[in-house]
Every structure is written in C-alpha cells, then in structure tokens.
C-alpha cells in the first residue's frame, strides 16, 4: 500500500479512485492531480513506479487535505459562531444552517424527538 498525505492508498484500485481515499480529494481533484503529474488515471497504484507515486505525493501536498482541512472547516464554523451571525446561531443551536424547513423535517440535525412535558 502506498502512503500519500498520511493515508494508506489501496493498491488494487485505479489511481483516480485510490486518491479519493484522502479527505479533501474528490473525483475531480483526483483527475486534475493525475493530469498534472501525467499519470494514467486508469492505471492501478501497484503498477505505478516509485517516481510516479512521489509525483502524486508532491501534487497532493499542494492541496489542503486531511487534518489541516478539518481544522480549517472547524475554525470557519467557530468564527461564524463567535461573530453571532445567523449562520453561527444556527450552528450553535444545532439546527439546519441553509434555510431548510424545521417544522416537520430536520430530524438528523435536531436529533431524536423529545416528548412534550405537561
């Protein structure tokens, strides 16, 4: 198994699919990485040379991935909450942030139903 950005990449899958195992790298980003390095997206990781894997590693290092990306996302949410803006308040209360209805739906975000106390 090749190790890129601190993640074990599966050997028996295509390069494009294997790169998506890295948090922050989707199909489109994986295809652009393959194009930038000149690696065949349909080639399996086990068939690549060490030089090609190093090229992939260097290209992935240019992108914010894994822990840094998670930290950045959490800092953005924390910033909204500290500002006290509408989106920050919705995050703080655990409600949907992007304008979805909450009268009947939003059970995932709100959690299980709470019984009405009399």
UniProtKB/Swiss-Prot annotation:
GO terms for cellular component: cytosol; small ribosomal subunit. Residues 94-118 are annotated as: Disordered. GO terms for molecular function: rRNA binding; structural constituent of ribosome; tRNA binding. GO terms for biological process: translation. Keywords: Ribonucleoprotein, Ribosomal protein, RNA-binding, rRNA-binding, tRNA-binding. It holds the Pfam family Ribosomal_S13. SUPFAM superfamilies: S13-like H2TH domain (SSF46946). Located at the top of the head of the 30S subunit, it contacts several helices of the 16S rRNA. In the 70S ribosome it contacts the 23S rRNA (bridge B1a) and protein L5 of the 50S subunit (bridge B1b), connecting the 2 subunits; these bridges are implicated in subunit movement. Contacts the tRNAs in the A and P-sites. Part of the 30S ribosomal subunit. Forms a loose heterodimer with protein S19. Forms two bridges to the 50S subunit in the 70S ribosome. Belongs to the universal ribosomal protein uS13 family. NCBIfam families: uS13_bact. This is Small ribosomal subunit protein uS13. It comes from Pseudomonas aeruginosa (strain ATCC 15692 / DSM 22644 / CIP 104116 / JCM 14847 / LMG 12228 / 1C / PRS 101 / PAO1). The lineage of its organism: Bacteria, Pseudomonadati, Pseudomonadota, Gammaproteobacteria, Pseudomonadales. The gene is rpsM.
């Amino acid at each position: 198994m090749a190790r890129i950005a601190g993640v074990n990449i599966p050997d028996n899958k295509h390069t494009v699919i294997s790169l998506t195992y890295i948090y922050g790298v989707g199909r489109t980003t994986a295809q652009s990485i393959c194009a930038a390095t000149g690696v065949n997206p349909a080639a399996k990781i086990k068939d690549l040379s060490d030089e090609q894997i190093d090229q992939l590693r260097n290209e992935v290092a240019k992108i914010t991935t894994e822990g840094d990306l998670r930290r950045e996302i959490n800092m953005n949410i924390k910033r909204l909450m500290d500002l006290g803006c509408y989106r920050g308040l919705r995050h703080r209360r655990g409600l949907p942030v992007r304008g979805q209805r909450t009268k009947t739906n939003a059970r995932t975000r709100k959690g299980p139903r709470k019984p009405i106390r009399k």
